[in-house]
């Protein structure tokens, strides 16, 4: 990539990960065009305007994932596009129409706008490690790498709609990019933990808050899970954009641990919090991730301690938790 910092677009800029990515890009000296549903919503976007460099180098524009052409203006003239936006998942009786189609079409609509932009150098798509790990035929002793894809049939059978939507959307993105000569790189983060910039907690941050308050409902399904600091994921997006040799998929995950190990760690580190002690044992295959590909580009992952220390400090600052004593 050109060493001079240029203009880039971040879709869904007000989201949990996207906000942190915008923060990182501004600190790196990029001019950032962020797409949002409603640029006039001052309350929802105030956290973006507070970022260092925002007044000089951030512009927010309206775009709708389900409207073809609505990203044209935001993307035109940008050297890079970071597509982090994805449809909001809600309980549904029609996952095909309300989860799968929006995820695929939303991604393709962004790529259709990218195709029209002669300045484009690279698109970085936020996918998910769930596009790799949902299989029933892998060897638990061999870490999962980027060559592996989640089983579509397994997702449908067990109604794992989020993983299926991410898998189908990423596969559609690869097909479209190959057919249209778009330089695409995908980032596959595991479960994000860390400070939250938006005023309202996303489902991920809300799940962590629930666990720290003693709730078991959301985390009981985690079983074996990869965790990663939000800053590592944002930095990964920038690293794979800037490294000319970067190509293909990049798993982005620090620790893969069991739920029992997680709550044991949390209870020991934050004894003043009512961390649940017991969860129902899930019969799931052990797995680990091979992250040598992204580490070969120089990325070093933050520790589990840093993830949760930063997350808890943010939750305290925002008033979701009272002061946590070590």
UniProtKB/Swiss-Prot annotation:
Its EC number is 1.1.1.-. Specifically expressed in anther tapetal cells during microspores development. It is an enzyme of class 1 (oxidoreductase). GO terms for molecular function: oxidoreductase activity. One of its GO terms (cellular component) is endoplasmic reticulum. Keywords: Cytoplasm, Endoplasmic reticulum, NADP, Nucleus, Oxidoreductase. InterPro entries: Epimerase_deHydtase, NAD(P)-bd_dom_sf, NAD(P)_dehydrat-like. Disruption phenotype: Male sterility due to distorted pollen grains lacking reticulate exine pattern. The keyword DNA damage does not apply. It is found in: Cytoplasm; Nucleus; Endoplasmic reticulum. Its main location: cytoplasm. It holds the Pfam family Epimerase. GO terms for biological process: pollen development; pollen exine formation; seed development; sporopollenin biosynthetic process. NADP(+) binds at residues 8-32, 44, 162. The keyword Nucleus applies. Involved in the biosynthesis of hydroxylated tetraketide compounds that serve as sporopollenin precursors (the main constituents of exine). Is essential for pollen wall development. Acts on tetraketide alpha-pyrones and reduces the carbonyl function on the tetraketide alkyl chain to a secondary alcohol function. PANTHER family: NAD DEPENDENT EPIMERASE/DEHYDRATASE, TETRAKETIDE ALPHA-PYRONE REDUCTASE 1. Belongs to the NAD(P)-dependent epimerase/dehydratase family. Dihydroflavonol-4-reductase subfamily. Interacts with 4CLL1/ACOS5, PKSA and PKSB. This is Tetraketide alpha-pyrone reductase 1. The gene is TKPR1.
């Amino acid at each position: 990539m050109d060493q001079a910092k240029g203009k880039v677009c971040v879709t869904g800029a007000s989201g949990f990960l996207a906000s942190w990515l915008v923060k990182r890009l501004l600190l790196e000296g990029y001019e950032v065009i962020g797409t949002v549903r409603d640029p006039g919503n001052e309350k929802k976007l105030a956290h973006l305007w507070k970022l260092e460099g925002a007044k000089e180098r951030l512009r927010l524009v309206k775009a709708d994932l389900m409207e073809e052409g609505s990203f044209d203006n935001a993307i035109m003239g940008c050297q890079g596009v970071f597509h982090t936006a994805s449809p909001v998942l809600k309980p549904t009786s029609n996952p095909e129409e309300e989860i799968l189609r929006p995820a695929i079409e939303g991604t393709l609509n962004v790529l259709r706008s990218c195709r029209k932009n002669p300045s484009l150098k690279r698109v970085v798509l936020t996918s998910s490690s769930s596009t790799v790990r949902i299989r029933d035929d892998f060897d638990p002793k061999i870490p999962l790498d980027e060559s592996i894809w989640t089983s579509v049939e397994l997702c449908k059978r067990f109604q794992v709609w989020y993983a299926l939507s991410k898998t189908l959307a990423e596969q559609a993105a690869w097909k479209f990019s190959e057919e249209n000569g778009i330089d695409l790189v995908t980032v596959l983060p595991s479960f994000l933990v860390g400070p939250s910039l938006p005023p309202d907690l996303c489902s991920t941050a809300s799940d962590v808050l629930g666990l720290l308050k003693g709730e078991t409902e959301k985390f009981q399904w985690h079983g074996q899970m990869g965790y990663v600091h939000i800053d590592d994921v944002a930095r990964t997006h920038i690293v794979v954009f800037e490294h000319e040799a970067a190509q293909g998929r990049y798993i982005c995950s620090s620790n893969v641990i069991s739920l029992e190990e997680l709550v044991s760690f949390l209870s020991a580190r934050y004894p003043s919090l009512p961390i649940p002690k017991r969860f129902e044992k899930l019969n799931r295959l052990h797995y680990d991730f091979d992250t040598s590909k992204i580490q070969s580009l120089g990325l070093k992952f933050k520790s589990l301690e840093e993830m949760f220390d930063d997350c808890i400090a943010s939750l305290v600052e925002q008033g979701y938790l009272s002061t946590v004593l070590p």
